[in-house]
Swiss-Prot record:
Protein name from the UniProt record: tRNA pseudouridine synthase A
UniProt binding sites for substrate: 111
Function: Formation of pseudouridine at positions 38, 39 and 40 in the anticodon stem and loop of transfer RNAs.
Enzyme Commission designation: 5.4.99.12
Organism for this UniProt entry: Thermotoga neapolitana (strain ATCC 49049 / DSM 4359 / NBRC 107923 / NS-E)
Amino acid sequence: MRRVAAIVEYDGSNFFGYQGQPDVRTVQGVIEDALERIFKQRIYTQAAGRTDAGVHANGQLIAFNCPNDRMTTEDIKNAMNANLPDDVYVKKVFEVPKNFHPRFDVKKRIYHYFIHTSREKNVFLRKYAWWFPYELDLEAMRKAAKYLEGTHDFTSFKTGSDERDPVRTIYRIRILSLGKDMILIRVEGRSFLRRMVRNIVAALVKVGLRQWEPEKLKEVLEARDRSAAAGTAPAHGLYFYKVLF
């Protein structure tokens, strides 16, 4: 039996997150339902990231064991897309080594977060960017972001329910202006704690509003206490953009 991987994009608006759960609509659930229709047996998948409800993906990576040796990777891609709903699309299918695991073999994960700063709401962006109609100091945010790059204990930026090792490495944070009304925060790292990126975004916004000095993020990081940080940015502005492996 061969092992294949797929790059998947999805609109997370109508999903209760990526990970399969009983009685609710999840991305993993609809993918495995589609695979069952194709191969006439339950196929279990693994993924590079478990996005929360409302979070989108441009480049989620999944892998599974394929019981059909005759289908080409293009055949598998086409069959999956024919059986998936409109808010999920398989961009590419390719073969990987039999022991490949997307969660453990990925070297870098990249997340994008979009903030729409126009004074006027755009109803077409309401599910795809955080509408935040206030001026943000991007230079101050960039200075603050530097304190988060590198290997640190990110306890202050995780949810209380995440019991994993809080030490994580952020390779780079970029804060870009996309025209006058859209800001992109790009976070690159090996792996992330639950809601870590959204909690980082909320803290950077505090700096952008000049409610915190950039150096405050160093204090928050060193506190290793979730209550020392800001809130959590909304899910719908976040995209699991890409993985490198």
